[in-house]
Regions:
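Active-site-proximal specificity loops/subdomain of glycosyltransferases
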Residues: 72-96
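A short acidic-Thr-Gly-centered motif at the start of a beta-strand
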Residues: 97-101
Length: 200
């Protein structure tokens, strides 16, 4: 797939961006989504992870976990099922749709300012702090997907999750709020809204 030039909008949530800032997403660059799910550890105050806690508390075919250990185990389970989902989606992309940007090595964007405002409203509803909405010039690739088609965070067989991932990578057909995955050379060309002063 050849790189193309296009403009999109990005809802900034972690660190403010500046006009002229350049971001490169290629096959070796991971995004914060990757780091959040694949590099984060869930440990109790003794340094035990979720699996060790489960093994230490499973006796006589019963499992009793409470307090800090229960929180660590539940966080570990939540992170693990979401990481499995992301791994399946990436596996299907690599095998069947390698021309599309990876969800683990991309920036998430919106096609229009109006869509960016919809994403901001969604983030606000989850109390996720939005710092800015910026306009980006991209020389790279994009994929428009429907997040509702991603594999669910449930216990269905992996074979069904693979089918769900396939449906996602077929592209957005009729979603009210598409997610745009972009990669390549990305430049901030305009700060449209700066909400950071509101959060002081």
């Amino acid at each position: 797939m050849n790189d193309i030039e296009f403009y999109v909008y990005h809802v900034v949530t972690r660190k403010k961006m500046k006009i002229g800032q350049i971001i490169h997403f290629d096959k070796n660059q991971t995004n914060t989504l990757y780091r959040f799910f694949f590099e984060r550890e869930q440990l109790n105050s003794s340094g035990d992870d979720g699996i060790k806690i489960i093994n230490n508390h499973y006796k006589n075919e019963e499992l009793h976990i409470k307090n800090e250990n229960a929180k660590v185990v539940m966080s570990y389970i939540d992170q693990t099922i979401r990481t499995v989902r992301k791994t399946i989606v990436e596996m299907v992309r690599l095998q069947e749709f390698p021309e599309y940007p990876s969800r683990l090595s991309c920036l998430y964007a919106a096609k229009s300012y109006e869509d960016a405002l919809k994403w901001k409203a969604l983030f606000d509803s989850y109390n996720r702090e939005v710092l800015q909405i910026v306009k980006l010039r991209v020389i790279g690739n994009c994929f428009e997907g429907d997040g509702n088609l991603l594999p669910k965070e449930d216990g269905i067989p992996f074979s069904q999750k693979i089918e769900q991932a396939r449906e996602y990578w077929k592209g957005n057909v009729s979603n009210e709020l598409p997610e745009l995955l972009i990669n390549g050379k990305i430049e901030v060309v305009e700060i449209i809204d700066d909400f950071s002063a509101i959060h002081i």
